C-alpha cells in the first residue's frame, strides 16, 4: 500500500467513527472544526488521487445511519448537507463557480443566514397540521421524533393563515439557547445527573429522549430554514420570500437573514455575524449562503451530496496559548505509540483543555517542540486538542527535548518504526496490556462482534484483573465473575453474558474485521470474505492470491498473510471457533451459471449516479456476479461513468477499457 493509500484509509476510518458518534450516539468527541479539517484533508488527498476514491468514503455520503431505538422515517426528499468553505478566497472561488455555471457576469443575489449549531430536523404538515417529524439521520432515513418535537413550544402544532399547502415539509434546526444550556447543567450538577459538554450535545440528547416528558422539560427552540415536500400549494420563487411566508404561517425564522448583492456584501455579513457571535445567546459555527432565486437554484442543481447553489462559510476554530509541562506516550490497539502533551490548563471554546495530541515523532520535529515551550493550541477535540505551532519568540530558557521511548512505556518491549511510516510501534503484541485492552475494545465494538453493554471500562477491568488475555477468554466469562467488577450487578452481568452469547452468531466479514488485522477495515474485510468465502481458504492464501482481491495491494496482503502465519493468532481463532463463534456458510455464486453481461467481470464505478446510489449499484452488480473494485487497473474489465467522472475515466480510456454510462448500466441490469 502506498503512503497516500494508508493516509486515506486512516482518515476514512477516523471520519466514520466521528460520524457515528455525532449522528447516531449524540456524543461527539471532536468539534465541527476538527471534523471539517479531517474531511478537507480527505478531499484534498482524494483530489490528488481520484482513482483511490471508494464508494463508501465519507466524501461520498451525507452522514451516518440512524439508531433503531426509534421508528424510522424515510425522507421523500433527501436531506442533503452543505459543502463548506473556510476562508474568503474559498468563498470567492465558490462565487465564481456559480457565476461560471450560470454563464453570467452579473452579481448573484445571495440570501445569507446564521449556521445554527443544533440538530437538523424535518417537520411535515398536512393541511396545516403537524403530523410527523424526523431527524436527518443519513440524509435518506431519519428517526421518528414526532412526540418530542410536539413538546417544543416554538414549533406550531397547526399553521395559521391563508394558502397553506396540502402537504408541506419544513426543514430547520432544533437548538438550545445558552441560558437554557447553563440551567440544564446547573440542575444536573445539583442532582448528580448528566452534564453536557456543549449546547449542541444537550439539544441532541434532549430531542432524542425515548420519553417525551423529559424533552418537554428542556427549553429547546427552533428556526426554520428550508423546505422538502411541497404538494397542493405554492411558495414564493425566492428563498427569502419562502422564509417570510413560513414566518407568516407561524413558523419561527431567524431575524438575522440578509440579502447580499455582491461577494463583498457577503463577506461583510460574515464578519459582522462573527463579531456579534458572543452576544447572540445561542451557538452558531458560521453562516449559510444561498442563491436567492429558486429558478437559478434549479439551474445550478446538485452534486452527489450537496446543492451547488449553497455553501456553509465556517468560522475558524478557536485558539489559545499555553505551556507544555510534559509529554507522555500512549499505546494503541496496533501498538502505535502516540505522544500526548500535558498542558498548563486553559479554557478553549468553553472547555478546560489540559492535553493535546502530538501525533508522532515527525510532527514533534515539524513543530520543533520542546517540553516547557509556549504553544498555540486549537480545539481539535473535546478530549485531546492539537498543538498548532510553537511560540519560538517566547521560548523559556529551561526547555527540554522530547525523547521518544526505545521501549514500550507499558510492557517494556522494543519499539520499531518501519521505514516510510510515521508511526512508532510497540512490538509486544498481546503481551502488552495496552494493546490487549485496545484490541479487545475493537473486538467487541459495534461494527465488529457487536457485544452490547461491554464498554471500555469493563474491558479495562477485565485486563487489569487478568480475567481476559485473548478475545476467546471473553466467551468464557461467567455472570459470577463479572459481578465482581466495579458497578456491575447480577442483572447487568447476566446481560453482558447474554450479549456475548448472541454475538457468537456473526458474519465472516465482521469476524475478520474484529480480529484487528493491520490495514483491514470493514470494506477490506468484506472484500476478503466475499472473495475467499471460507476462513480455511483465506488462511491458506498466498500473498499473490491475496492481491487478487479488489483493492488489496502488497502492503495489506502482507499484513493479512503475516497475521495468519503467526501461530498465536491461529490458536486464538481456533479457540474462538471452539467457543461457538460461527457464521452462515457462504453463498457461492457460480458466474458461469449467471446469465448477465456483468458475470465474472471486474467493474469500477466512477462519478455520481442519478438513478440509484453507488451502494445500490454495487450491490446489484455483485448479485450479478461482478467484482466491484475501487480503482482502475489492467485487471479492470468495465468502467461505469456517471456525471463528473474524473481520472478513473481518463485512465480507463488510456488503457482501452470499455466504458459505459449510467443509462447503459441500468439497461444491462435489467437485461
Curated annotation (Swiss-Prot):
Needed cofactors, names only, are: Mg(2+); Mn(2+)
Quote the EC number.
6.5.1.2
GO biological process entries: DNA repair; DNA replication
Record-linked Gene3D superfamilies:
5' to 3' exonuclease, C-terminal subdomain, 6.20.10.30, BRCT domain, DNA ligase/mRNA capping enzyme, Helix hairpin bin, Nucleic acid-binding proteins
BRCT domain mapped to chain residues: 593-671
The task this protein performs is described as: DNA ligase that catalyzes the formation of phosphodiester linkages between 5'-phosphoryl and 3'-hydroxyl groups in double-stranded DNA using NAD as a coenzyme and as the energy source for the reaction. It is essential for DNA replication and repair of damaged DNA.
Q: Which organism is it from?
A: Salmonella typhimurium (strain LT2 / SGSC1412 / ATCC 700720)
Please state which protein family the record places this protein in.
Answer: Belongs to the NAD-dependent DNA ligase family. LigA subfamily.
Task: Say if the entry is tagged with keyword Zinc.
Answer: yes
| Residues that hold NAD(+) according to the record | 32-36, 81-82, 113, 136, 173, 290, 314
- Provide a Gene Ontology MF annotation, just one: DNA ligase (NAD+) activity
Pfam families from the xrefs?
A: BRCT, DNA_ligase_aden, DNA_ligase_OB, DNA_ligase_ZBD, HHH_2, HHH_5, Nlig-Ia
This protein is called: DNA ligase
Q: What is the lineage of its organism?
A: Bacteria, Pseudomonadati, Pseudomonadota, Gammaproteobacteria, Enterobacterales
Amino acid at each position: 500500500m502506498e503512503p497516500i493509500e494508508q493516509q486515506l484509509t486512516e482518515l476514512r476510518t477516523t471520519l466514520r467513527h466521528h460520524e457515528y458518534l455525532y449522528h447516531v450516539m449524540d456524543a461527539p468527541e471532536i468539534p465541527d472544526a476538527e471534523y471539517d479539517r479531517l474531511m478537507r484533508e480527505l478531499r484534498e488527498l482524494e483530489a490528488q488521487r481520484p482513482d483511490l476514491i471508494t464508494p463508501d468514503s465519507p466524501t461520498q455520503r451525507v452522514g451516518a445511519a440512524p439508531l433503531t431505538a426509534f421508528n424510522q422515517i424515510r425522507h421523500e426528499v433527501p436531506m442533503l448537507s452543505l459543502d463548506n468553505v473556510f476562508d474568503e478566497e474559498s468563498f470567492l472561488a465558490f462565487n465564481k463557480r456559480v457565476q461560471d455555471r450560470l454563464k453570467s457576469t452579473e452579481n448573484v443575489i445571495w440570501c445569507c443566514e446564521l449556521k445554527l449549531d443544533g440538530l437538523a430536523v424535518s417537520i411535515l404538515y398536512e393541511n396545516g397540521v403537524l403530523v410527523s417529524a424526523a431527524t436527518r439521520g443519513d440524509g435518506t432515513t431519519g428517526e421518528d421524533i414526532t412526540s418530542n418535537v410536539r413538546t417544543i413550544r416554538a414549533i406550531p402544532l397547526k399553521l395559521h393563515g391563508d394558502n397553506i399547502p396540502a402537504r408541506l415539509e419544513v426543514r430547520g434546526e432544533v437548538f438550545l439557547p445558552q441560558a437554557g444550556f447553563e440551567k440544564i447543567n446547573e440542575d444536573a450538577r445539583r442532582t448528580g445527573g448528566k452534564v453536557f459538554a456543549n449546547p449542541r450535545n444537550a439539544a441532541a440528547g434532549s430531542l432524542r429522549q425515548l420519553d417525551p416528558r423529559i424533552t418537554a422539560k428542556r427549553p429547546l427552540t427552533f428556526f426554520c430554514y428550508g423546505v422538502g415536500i411541497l404538494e397542493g400549494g405554492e411558495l414564493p420563487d425566492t428563498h427569502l420570500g419562502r422564509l417570510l411566508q413560513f414566518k407568516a404561517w407561524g413558523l419561527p425564522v431567524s431575524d438575522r437573514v440578509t440579502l447580499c448583492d455582491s461577494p463583498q456584501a457577503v463577506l461583510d455579513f460574515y464578519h459582522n455575524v462573527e463579531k456579534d457571535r458572543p452576544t447572540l445567546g445561542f451557538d452558531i459555527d458560521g453562516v449559510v449562503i444561498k442563491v436567492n432565486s429558486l429558478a437559478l437554484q434549479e439551474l445550478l442543481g446538485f452534486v452527489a451530496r450537496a446543492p451547488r447553489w449553497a455553501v456553509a462559510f465556517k468560522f475558524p476554530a478557536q485558539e489559545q496559548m499555553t505551556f507544555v509541562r510534559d509529554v507522555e506516550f500512549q499505546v494503541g490497539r496496533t501498538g502505535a505509540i502516540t505522544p500526548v502533551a500535558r498542558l498548563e490548563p486553559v479554557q478553549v471554546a468553553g472547555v478546560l483543555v489540559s492535553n493535546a495530541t502530538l501525533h508522532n515523532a515527525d510532527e514533534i520535529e515539524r513543530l520543533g517542540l520542546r517540553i516547557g515551550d509556549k504553544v498555540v493550541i486549537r480545539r481539535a477535540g473535546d478530549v485531546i486538542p492539537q498543538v498548532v505551532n510553537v511560540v519560538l519568540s517566547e521560548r523559556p530558557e529551561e526547555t527540554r527535548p522530547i525523547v521518544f521511548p526505545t521501549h514500550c512505556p507499558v510492557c517494556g518491549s522494543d519499539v520499531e518504526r518501519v521505514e516510510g511510516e510515521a508511526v512508532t510501534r510497540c512490538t509486544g503484541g498481546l503481551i502488552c496490556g495496552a494493546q490487549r485492552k485496545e484490541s479487545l475494545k475493537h473486538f467487541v465494538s459495534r461494527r465488529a462482534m457487536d457485544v452490547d453493554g461491554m464498554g471500555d471500562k469493563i474491558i479495562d477491568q477485565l485486563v487489569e484483573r487478568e480475567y481476559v488475555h485473548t478475545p476467546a477468554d471473553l466467551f468464557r466469562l461467567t455472570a459470577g465473575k463479572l459481578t465482581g467488577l466495579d458497578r456491575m450487578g447480577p442483572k447487568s452481568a447476566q446481560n453482558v453474558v447474554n450479549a456475548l452469547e448472541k454475538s457468537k452468531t456473526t458474519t465472516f466479514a465482521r469476524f475478520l474485521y474484529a480480529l484487528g488485522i493491520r490495514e483491514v477495515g470493514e470494506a477490506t474485510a468484506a472484500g476478503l470474505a466475499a472473495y475467499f468465502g471460507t476462513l480455511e481458504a483465506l488462511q491458506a492464501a498466498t500473498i499473490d492470491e491475496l492481491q487478487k482481491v479488489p483493492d488489496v495491494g502488497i502492503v495489506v496482503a502482507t499484513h493479512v498473510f503475516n497475521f495468519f502465519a503467526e501461530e498465536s493468532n491461529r490458536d486464538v481463532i481456533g479457540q474462538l471457533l471452539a467457543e461457538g463463534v460461527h457464521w452462515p456458510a457462504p453463498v457461492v455464486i457460480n458466474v458461469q451459471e449467471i446469465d448477465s453481461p456483468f458475470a465474472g467481470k471486474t467493474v469500477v464505478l466512477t462519478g455520481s449516479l442519478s438513478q440509484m446510489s453507488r451502494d445500490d449499484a454495487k450491490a446489484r452488480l455483485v448479485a450479478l456476479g461482478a467484482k466491484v473494485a475501487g480503482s482502475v487497473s489492467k485487471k479492470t474489465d468495465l468502467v461505469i461513468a456517471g456525471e463528473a467522472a474524473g481520472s478513473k475515466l481518463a485512465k480507463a480510456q488510456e488503457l482501452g477499457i470499455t466504458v459505459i454510462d449510467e443509462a447503459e448500466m441500468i439497461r444491462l441490469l435489467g437485461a
